[in-house]
């Protein structure tokens, strides 16, 4: 797993069934002293003992944004999930997301800025791809990153570096963080 945009990243395991997802979740859960994004909390414990089922969990009220999805398959899947969860006693309420129009540009600035920092370690010395037969250290860095990253990744790294640079940090990155908080 590679960190792309730490404040936005979320591990999303793909499993055959809910029990496998619960088991994997129990391994991922909890405090890791080597992970600055983890927390130690009893609140988020997950028990698999005694074949616990979803119907026994606390009933939730789930906010569903008034957005509509572009793809019919997404809408159909969401409606099916909503029916199942309502059948288990959970409640859905329609919600408004303020400033949603600014979310894509805010995401792009934050993700690119964090990616430029997170991906800087992939220089061929300790992490990631390494070019063959570099002439010197500068050649190692340039060729490793040129050959190892695709065009879109390079574009995002450059965009993020620009957003974090002196003179543009407040104008782009801090503004994007404020927009994210408003949403």
Enumerate the language-model features and the residues they cover.
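Acyltransferase
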Residues: 45-46, 72-97, 123, 127-129, ...
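Short glycine/threonine-rich loop-to-helix capping motif typified by GTGT followed
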Residues: 74-76, 104-113
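Charge-dense, low-complexity intrinsically disordered segments
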Residues: 15, 72, 106, 131, ...
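Short helix-loop capping/hinge segments that flank enzyme active sites or metal/cofactor-binding pockets
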Residues: 56-65, 113-182
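A short helix-breaking turn/cap at a secondary-structure junction
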Residues: 1-77, 81, 139, 143
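Glycine-rich, flexible loop/turn motifs
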Residues: 4-10, 33-35, 40-42, 100-106, ...
